[in-house]
C-alpha cells in the first residue's frame, strides 16, 4: 500500500465520520437511535424481511437486531407477522408511523445537506456525486 493510499483511506474515513455526525444531529428530537433508524430505513426501502435477513443487511449480529426490532415494535414503528412459508419465522415491516418517521428524518438530513451543497459550484457537486457512487460501490462490495 502506498502512503498516498493510506492517507486517502484516513482522510475519507474522517470525512465520512464527520458527515455522519452532522447528519445525525439534523433530527435531534428523534425517538430512535441511529441503528434503529437505519433498520427502519432498510425496511422502508426494501420491504418486509426476517430479522435474520435484516441483521445481515445491517451487518449486525442477530441478537442485536432482535433487540432493535423489539424496541421499534414497542414504539409502534414496525409490524411483525408470521412468515407465510416458515412458521418458525416472522416478517418485520415498517408501520405507517415508522414510514413517517423515516420520511421526516430523511427530509431533515436532505434539507441541511442540500443547503450545504448549494455553497459549492457545479463542478464540485459533480465530483461529490461521483464520489458518492464510488463510496457506495466500496461499501456494497465489502465482505
UniProtKB/Swiss-Prot annotation:
Keyword Signal attached: no
Gene3D superfamilies xrefs: Winged helix-like DNA-binding domain superfamily/Winged helix DNA-binding domain
Domain HTH marR-type, first and last residues per copy: 5-137
InterPro entries registered for this protein in UniProt: HTH-type_Bedaq_tolerance, HTH_MarR-typ, Tscrpt_reg_MarR-type_CS, WH-like_DNA-bd_sf, WH_DNA-bd_sf
Keyword DNA-binding: yes
Subunit structure: Homodimer.
Protein name: Uncharacterized HTH-type transcriptional regulator ML2140
Organism: Mycobacterium leprae (strain TN)
Phylogenetic lineage: Bacteria, Bacillati, Actinomycetota, Actinomycetes, Mycobacteriales
Amino acid at each position: 500500500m502506498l502512503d498516498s493510499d493510506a492517507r486517502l483511506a484516513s482522510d475519507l474515513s474522517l470525512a465520512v465520520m464527520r458527515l455522519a455526525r452532522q447528519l445525525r444531529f439534523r433530527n435531534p428530537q428523534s425517538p430512535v437511535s441511529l441503528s434503529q433508524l437505519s433498520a427502519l430505513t432498510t425496511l422502508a426501502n426494501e420491504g418486509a424481511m426476517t430479522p435474520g435477513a435484516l441483521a445481515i443487511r445491517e451487518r449486525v449480529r442477530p441478537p442485536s437486531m432482535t433487540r432493535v426490532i423489539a424496541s421499534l415494535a414497542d414504539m409502534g414503528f414496525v409490524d411483525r407477522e408470521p412468515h407465510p412459508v416458515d412458521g418458525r419465522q416472522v416478517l418485520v415491516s415498517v408501520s405507517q408511523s415508522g414510514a413517517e418517521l423515516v420520511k421526516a428524518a430523511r427530509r431533515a438530513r436532505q434539507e441541511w445537506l442540500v443547503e450545504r451543497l448549494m455553497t459549492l459550484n457545479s463542478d464540485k457537486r459533480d465530483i461529490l456525486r461521483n464520489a458518492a457512487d464510488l463510496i457506495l460501490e466500496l461499501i456494497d462490495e465489502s465482505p
